[in-house]
Amino acid sequence: MAMDSKKEIRLKRELGYFWGTNFLIINIIGAGIFVSPKGVLQHSSMNVGVSLCVWAVCAVLTLTSALCSAEIGITFPYSGAHYYFLKRCFGPLVAFLRLWTSLFLGPGLIASQALLLAEYGVQPFYPSCSAPILPRKCLALAMLWIVGILNSRGVKELSWLQTVSSVLKVGILGVISLSGLFLLVRGKKENVQRLQNAFDAEFPEVSQLIEAIFQGYFAFSGGGCFTCIAGELKKPSKTIPRCIFTGLPLVTVVYLLANISYLTVLTPQEMLSSDAVALTWTDRVIPQFTWTVPFAISASLFINLVINVLETSRVLYIASENGQLPLLFCALNVHSSPFIAVLLIISMASILIVLTNLIDLINYLYFVVSIWTALSIIGILKLRYQEPNLHRPYKVFLPFTFIALGITLSLVLIPLVKSPKLHYIYVFLFLLSGLVFYVPLIHFKVKFVWFQKLTCYLQLLFNICIPDVSDDHIHEES
């Protein structure tokens, strides 16, 4: 555990610019760019020029949201800052409902990713049919507990894995991009004409264009990840903006060049009909390296699994520090990792893997994530008005805040209007069910004596310790 001259025990601030930039890149670049970057093209009416413009617009929209999150993470530099920020702006009830969502959405997402990773690992052994469910579940559970062990070793131990994953993703996309540019310069006439006449196809309607922007915006999701680990970054007021202005332009260039490369080799119709665009591209251009694409997809899923466990555990950590979860969940092991929080997440995800039918229901909670994001942006405006003298080392440009709020509210309202489903009612009922626990445990502060004994026993069993209050928290409370 981290101990300074005053023997304080807390999460270490030991992550710098290079780690933060890698963290942002691997959060944004997922398996989607290898498998199905065709949603934007499809909703752009297969207009190549419009689809590339949409990718660029989505990058700008993502930048506005990322900078809003940066203000939160820099003003309140704690791990799990988005939870703390909601509590600061809207009170303990809203923060608890945010926590209540994370307790189920986090493990649900992790279980889904583990099963998908297992499917890519098992399927090659069953070339003529679908892989049986039992081997997939066993492999998913094995990978999940490996991820749990890695997370329990602390953030610093994940650096090498994160660097390898980042180099792998950007490297393979770089090969695709550079090969595409080479083919564009020295390629066939029809390939060159496809991009020269990029805007000749029919222009999409406004509704289609909006849908294309949503598709692209989802591909850039993850730009607000620094609020989860702000408490472990060195000099967050400098590190976070630098990482955003380095990582996001790099991802944008890679996305644009990869799409140009795909469109140089494949027609729009071929892209839409392909189940894995990068695999089709590689099979046509460099057939000897077709195996690299499934490998890159598996690596992307694995590192995203690691990062999602890390981010969810930090929400439980700060909720425990703020008294909305037992102190046990912020207890740190010798590697400065919230071990019990990680253990709970892995255990819940394991149960969901066994009971696969529950994962689809939990994934509907994604809808609620946009609500929390919108509330966070509203909170920025609220604090600007109520606490104008609050120390803010970084302030996002106000028009960016309104742009980010507009796109986030659209993500909430358009699904409700366009395709209302009964599941959304279930989501709201689930959200309200958090009150059953909030009222007795948080509002009336009901305590269980046996849990205090359990806390002492588990501290001895796992060699974990409750952290001290950091200087940041002392300053904030004063």
Swiss-Prot record:
Give the UniProt tissue specificity note: Expressed in renal tubules in the outer stripe of the outer medulla and medullary ray (at protein level). Detected in male but not in female kidney.
Compartments where found = Apical cell membrane
Q: Which GO terms describe its molecular function?
A: antiporter activity; protein heterodimerization activity
* Pfam families, per the entry: AA_permease_2
Q: Where, by residue number, does the polypeptide cross the bilayer?
A: 15-35, 48-68, 90-110, 130-150, 164-184, 209-229, 243-263, 289-309, 339-359, 361-381, 396-416, 424-444
Q: Name one GO biological process term.
A: L-glutamate transmembrane transport
Which residue stretches are annotated as topological domain Cytoplasmic?
A: 1-14, 69-89, 151-163, 230-242, 310-338, 382-395, 445-478
Those parts of the protein on the Extracellular side are 36-47, 111-129, 185-208, 264-288, 360, 417-423
Give the CC-aspect GO terms: apical plasma membrane
Q: Where is it mostly found?
A: membrane
Record note on quaternary structure: Disulfide-linked heterodimer composed of the catalytic light subunit SLC7A13 and the heavy subunit SLC3A1.
What job does this protein perform? Associates with SLC3A1/rBAT to form a functional heterodimeric complex that transports anionic and neutral amino acids across the apical plasma membrane of renal epithelium. Preferentially mediates exchange transport, but can also operate via facilitated diffusion. May act as a major transporter for L-cystine in late proximal tubules, ensuring its reabsorption from the luminal fluid in exchange for cytosolic L-glutamate or L-aspartate.
Query: What family does the entry list?
Result: Belongs to the amino acid-polyamine-organocation (APC) superfamily.
Q: What is this protein called?
A: Solute carrier family 7 member 13
